[in-house]
Amino acid sequence: MSTAEFAQLLENSILSPDQNIRLTSETQLKKLSNDNFLQFAGLSSQVLIDENTKLEGRILAALTLKNELVSKDSVKTQQFAQRWITQVSPEAKNQIKTNALTALVSIEPRIANAAAQLIAAIADIELPHGAWPELMKIMVDNTGAEQPENVKRASLLALGYMCESADPQSQALVSSSNNILIAIVQGAQSTETSKAVRLAALNALADSLIFIKNNMEREGERNYLMQVVCEATQAEDIEVQAAAFGCLCKIMSLYYTFMKPYMEQALYALTIATMKSPNDKVASMTVEFWSTICEEEIDIAYELAQFPQSPLQSYNFALSSIKDVVPNLLNLLTRQNEDPEDDDWNVSMSAGACLQLFAQNCGNHILEPVLEFVEQNITADNWRNREAAVMAFGSIMDGPDKVQRTYYVHQALPSILNLMNDQSLQVKETTAWCIGRIADSVAESIDPQQHLPGVVQACLIGLQDHPKVATNCSWTIINLVEQLAEATPSPIYNFYPALVDGLIGAANRIDNEFNARASAFSALTTMVEYATDTVAETSASISTFVMDKLGQTMSVDENQLTLEDAQSLQELQSNILTVLAAVIRKSPSSVEPVADMLMGLFFRLLEKKDSAFIEDDVFYAISALAASLGKGFEKYLETFSPYLLKALNQVDSPVSITAVGFIADISNSLEEDFRRYSDAMMNVLAQMISNPNARRELKPAVLSVFGDIASNIGADFIPYLNDIMALCVAAQNTKPENGTLEALDYQIKVLEAVLDAYVGIVAGLHDKPEALFPYVGTIFQFIAQVAEDPQLYSEDATSRAAVGLIGDIAAMFPDGSIKQFYGQDWVIDYIKRTRSGQLFSQATKDTARWAREQQKRQLSL
């Protein structure tokens, strides 16, 4: 294929008025990428610099190639990187990179922008492998003072993209930090006359800060960088100012420990003054700066509470700033959007979020200035002041001690409830939110006789109001039920009939504007989950409502619906199924007579041509039915199996994870009878976990379900044991793919799933110790890993399972054959820590005591 032909394909795929031509062109491009990536990549880079090709085609060439190098899916990104490394020759790589760098300095900004993204994608693959070593020098040279504006801007943009997409622990970028910093500072300093260059430099700085730790640790370099950023906050251009404050937020987040002198010398006064800026964007960024300070100090306080020996130190910036910052925040609360239906983030919302963080950080110290503001404004003539007062009160419901909050809620609640009848929609919406905050954070302050009837009445009125008010009222009801249901006796059940009637009315809305209908269904789900026998009749009315509602949706002729109406119907069915699943789980004994009818409805829903949207919810409801019926569900398995296998095979879809969870539910329902299906299910699960295209969330889901199956089929799991243990060992030994929080969290999920698997395997083989014996050492190695990782051992459920495993294994081997494992220092220490840990539940401490007894028996053998 020639460059001209390839360019024509690109142009057709985006510019052709004929949809068939567009689709055909896209298909041909994808086919070429799959069949001959070397040619595809080369042609893309040639079109990018071909000035005879239309602008849109050139831009698309860069972006299409970029999208074949990186993906939001980490598995695909690894596959793309391997393809680039193995299928593209060194000569071709050099030519593609040369073409990308040529396009980067184009005077057409859209070409340069696309090239910057392409360069970052290539760098993301090459730099970690030590390739393209000259790139950083090129970037520095491109940002020199003598370079044209367009070259500097585009090169800084590329640097920002590189840093944004890279692994935070990338040694390639850390080792290039000097060059990165030189390039950025050249563009960010006040001597740079171009706004576009300065803005690009500041944005790149925000993305690069994590890689310049070594530079920030050197006082001279840190001082100079802080000077450049502080000067930028005083620029005449609003965008540059806002970007500079964005950098200060990131600097405070990453380098809090160095910030004391800068706060004292400049940042404190600078940010206080700038909070009064008439420009909302700049004021918002300044508020964000103080939010960042609060977040850091909250984290430090938590760290010091958990680990008193930690070297971290809090400078209490927020606490010492209350008298200056909080009054400004309170004033900013009155700068709301004029349009009550405008939900765009604004400076008022930023101030409210910041006030919440100040309350969490400073506790009772926040009360005086806020309550004074509330008292002065809650009955003001201007709706902005009334709304701000209610927002301020709701924002301090988490932080000060409960005695103080309870006292002030008693005083303020009558006035707040009155505002549910306000003429201003904004005031009513925020009032409903404020009541929800009270119910969530300090529900015990709502006196059952004095306040609760008024709160419930306010919610019932709000459910019939504007959708935004109704949504907040549903949330308030959820909080009331969750927080008050545990009381003995609970006052909330007296109001169940009225609340359910109100929610059913809201759930019958014809639309879901501002999520009002869905919120009502969520509240109904909560009502079901917390219902007791005293409100059985009311619970039955929810069951009747959702069954009738589901029947109504099933009778709709979907062929006559517009796309928007069809989506609304699917959304409604999803909401109904969520409540129905809760009803089924809550009343398992009443399910059997209607099980055939329910399964018939579920099969009809799965048969719909566009069932993908609700498939997950249908599976969740069927799981609830399986759990309720127990072994009685087996009669549906033959009919249901094709749907289950279809879902399991959709390894790139969330429904596959739900389907895996369904297997766990089925194995728990059928117990030992699940052995009849274990061969087929284990085969499918093994294929899923080894599929390179599978969603990565599948791995922990599948590992965990192995434990469910093992615990239920017992000795019949032995034929799979060797293969499953190999998978578990591989999983427990894998390292995070990078240093991002997402990657670290995923690794924790995988390790927790391995623990689930081991717990199930040990439980299932309790009568077959000889089968487990070869793997005891492996399991103990894993428990040691848990005992050493604070992210694992600090979790109550995780430590309970791990020490329980130590005890369970000991009980299986009363002959002393595994005695050597129980004398290890870490075993003694871990059991002791778990038994005496203040943060652990009594159940976990009891499990640790039992494990200690089992350990002592082992050592006495």
Swiss-Prot record:
<dbReference type="GO" id="GO:0008139">
    <property type="term" value="F:nuclear localization sequence binding"/>
</dbReference>
<dbReference type="GO" id="GO:0005643">
    <property type="term" value="C:nuclear pore"/>
</dbReference>
<feature type="repeat" description="HEAT 17">
    <location>
        <begin position="718"/>
        <end position="764"/>
    </location>
</feature>
<dbReference type="GO" id="GO:0006606">
    <property type="term" value="P:protein import into nucleus"/>
</dbReference>
<dbReference type="InterPro" id="IPR016024">
    <property type="entry name" value="ARM-type_fold"/>
</dbReference>
<keyword id="KW-0653">Protein transport</keyword>
<dbReference type="GO" id="GO:0060188">
    <property type="term" value="P:regulation of protein desumoylation"/>
</dbReference>
<dbReference type="InterPro" id="IPR040122">
    <property type="entry name" value="Importin_beta"/>
</dbReference>
<dbReference type="Pfam" id="PF03810">
    <property type="entry name" value="IBN_N"/>
</dbReference>
<feature type="repeat" description="HEAT 6">
    <location>
        <begin position="219"/>
        <end position="255"/>
    </location>
</feature>
<dbReference type="GO" id="GO:0031267">
    <property type="term" value="F:small GTPase binding"/>
</dbReference>
<dbReference type="InterPro" id="IPR001494">
    <property type="entry name" value="Importin-beta_N"/>
</dbReference>
<dbReference type="GO" id="GO:0051170">
    <property type="term" value="P:import into nucleus"/>
</dbReference>
<dbReference type="GO" id="GO:0006612">
    <property type="term" value="P:protein targeting to membrane"/>
</dbReference>
<dbReference type="GO" id="GO:0051028">
    <property type="term" value="P:mRNA transport"/>
</dbReference>
<dbReference type="GO" id="GO:0061608">
    <property type="term" value="F:nuclear import signal receptor activity"/>
</dbReference>
<feature type="repeat" description="HEAT 16">
    <location>
        <begin position="675"/>
        <end position="713"/>
    </location>
</feature>
<feature type="domain" description="Importin N-terminal">
    <location>
        <begin position="25"/>
        <end position="106"/>
    </location>
</feature>
<feature type="repeat" description="HEAT 10">
    <location>
        <begin position="402"/>
        <end position="442"/>
    </location>
</feature>
<feature type="repeat" description="HEAT 1">
    <location>
        <begin position="3"/>
        <end position="35"/>
    </location>
</feature>
<feature type="modified residue" description="Phosphoserine">
    <location>
        <position position="836"/>
    </location>
</feature>
<feature type="repeat" description="HEAT 13">
    <location>
        <begin position="536"/>
        <end position="586"/>
    </location>
</feature>
<feature type="repeat" description="HEAT 7">
    <location>
        <begin position="260"/>
        <end position="306"/>
    </location>
</feature>
<dbReference type="InterPro" id="IPR011989">
    <property type="entry name" value="ARM-like"/>
</dbReference>
<dbReference type="GO" id="GO:0097718">
    <property type="term" value="F:disordered domain specific binding"/>
</dbReference>
<keyword id="KW-0509">mRNA transport</keyword>
<feature type="repeat" description="HEAT 3">
    <location>
        <begin position="90"/>
        <end position="129"/>
    </location>
</feature>
<keyword id="KW-0597">Phosphoprotein</keyword>
<dbReference type="GO" id="GO:0005634">
    <property type="term" value="C:nucleus"/>
</dbReference>
<dbReference type="InterPro" id="IPR000225">
    <property type="entry name" value="Armadillo"/>
</dbReference>
<feature type="repeat" description="HEAT 19">
    <location>
        <begin position="819"/>
        <end position="859"/>
    </location>
</feature>
<feature type="repeat" description="HEAT 9">
    <location>
        <begin position="367"/>
        <end position="395"/>
    </location>
</feature>
<feature type="repeat" description="HEAT 12">
    <location>
        <begin position="496"/>
        <end position="530"/>
    </location>
</feature>
<keyword id="KW-0539">Nucleus</keyword>
<dbReference type="GO" id="GO:0051292">
    <property type="term" value="P:nuclear pore complex assembly"/>
</dbReference>
<dbReference type="GO" id="GO:0061676">
    <property type="term" value="F:importin-alpha family protein binding"/>
</dbReference>
<feature type="repeat" description="HEAT 8">
    <location>
        <begin position="317"/>
        <end position="362"/>
    </location>
</feature>
<dbReference type="GO" id="GO:0042564">
    <property type="term" value="C:NLS-dependent protein nuclear import complex"/>
</dbReference>
<keyword id="KW-0007">Acetylation</keyword>
<dbReference type="GO" id="GO:0005635">
    <property type="term" value="C:nuclear envelope"/>
</dbReference>
<protein>
    <recommendedName>
        <fullName>Importin subunit beta-1</fullName>
    </recommendedName>
</protein>
<feature type="repeat" description="HEAT 14">
    <location>
        <begin position="592"/>
        <end position="629"/>
    </location>
</feature>
